[in-house]
Amino acid sequence: MSRLSHSEVHMVHRIGWLRAAVLGANDGLVSTASLVVGVAAAGSARPEILIAGLAGLVAGAMSMAAGEYVSVSSQTDAEQADIARETRELRETPEAELDELTRNYVARGLDESLARQVATQLTEKDALGAHSRDELGIPETVTAHPIQAALVSAATFAVGAVVPLIIAVLAPAAQITLFVAITTLAALAVLGGLGASAGGAGIFKGAMRVTFWGALAMAATAGVGMLFGVVA
């Protein structure tokens, strides 16, 4: 009975949207909070801080969307080019492709007769799928989706960027830097933990690594803000 009810959920199925979501939200938090902290540390008033933060949100979301779309599109183009070439080779030289698939399975540990049998059966069922998966290394579960990655990155960036802006609105004017920094570090810890948990990694490690880099980014921009604030 346990065999019949057994099912597995693999983390690799989530890798496309998970990568874009975590990267987008993390970047939105860190970049916008760092911008707010830097401008506030320079002695700017609340309206200037909010304008800078809102501009950073819009520009960052668009940049993330464009960057993810271009990056993933390039990956997709490469995959499609390889698949097109494999399709042509399967049509023009099927025996050579069968031999190639057989050698692939022999290299993985099967004896030659069994490898030939496996290659033949998989070719009869779905030749292109077998070659794409076992020769080119392009499994269907991780095929790139440019539009999905772009939309997820832009949306999650905006969600992450909203957090420091809300704090900048609500915090006392003289303590915007402190409130934004503390809230952002807490949000980064939660985000890192959730991302690590969704990906099957350690929660503490995931939380600590994003918190460290977020703190470093805010410290650097605060230093820049204080330097120019003093000069001004």
Model-derived features with residue positions:
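Structural signature of hydrophobic alpha-helical transmembrane segments
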Residues: 174-187
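The feature identifies polytopic integral membrane transport proteins across all domains of life
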Residues: 13-24, 46-54, 114, 146-151, ...
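Interfacial loop-to-transmembrane junctions
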Residues: 190-215
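Cytosol/matrix-facing amphipathic helices and coiled-coil assembly/linker segments
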Residues: 1-20, 72-154
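Juxtamembrane boundary at the C-terminal end of a transmembrane helix
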Residues: 222-232
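Core segments of transmembrane alpha-helices
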Residues: 28-33, 153-163
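Internal alpha-helical transmembrane segments
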Residues: 1-71
